[in-house]
Curated annotation (Swiss-Prot):
Gene3D superfamilies: Transcriptional coactivator/pterin dehydratase. Substrate binds at residues 61-63, 78-81. GO terms for cellular component: cytoplasm; nucleus. Homotetramer and homodimer. It comes from Xenopus laevis (African clawed frog). Its EC number is 4.2.1.96. This is Pterin-4-alpha-carbinolamine dehydratase.
C-alpha cells in the first residue's frame, strides 16, 4: 500500500471508533488495537467468512490477527507499520462487518 501510515489521532479516534463500538468492536487493554469475536451457524460459514476477509486483506496488504474455533472467529486489528490503530484497521473492520452481515 502506497504512502506512509500514521497512527490515529485522538480526534480521528473520536470520529471513527464509535460506529465500530456500536457493533461490538472494542479496544484491547494494554495494546493499541481493536478486536471482535464473530459467531456463525457452523464451521463452513465461519471458514467462508475468513476466506472472504482474507481475499480483501490481501488486496489491501493489511492482514488481521485471528483464530478460529468451529463456529467462532476472533479478529484483532492493529497496524504494525505505525505501532497501533490506523485508518487501515478502520477500513478493514468496516469491510469485515459487511461480510459478516451478508452471512447472517
Amino acid at each position: 500500500m502506497a504512502g506512509k501510515v500514521h497512527r490515529l489521532s485522538g480526534e480521528e479516534r473520536e470520529q471513527l471508533l464509535p460506529n465500530l463500538r456500536a457493533v461490538g468492536w472494542h479496544e484491547l487493554d494494554g495494546r493499541d488495537a481493536i478486536c471482535k469475536e464473530f459467531h456463525f451457524k457452523d464451521f463452513n460459514r465461519a471458514f467462508g467468512f475468513m476466506t472472504r476477509v482474507a481475499l480483501q486483506a490481501e488486496k489491501l496488504d493489511h492482514h488481521p490477527e485471528w483464530f478460529n474455533v468451529y463456529d467462532k472467529v476472533h479478529i484483532t486489528l492493529s497496524t504494525h507499520d505505525c505501532g497501533g490503530l490506523s485508518e487501515r484497521d478502520i477500513n478493514l473492520a468496516s469491510f469485515i462487518e459487511q461480510i459478516a452481515a451478508s452471512l447472517s
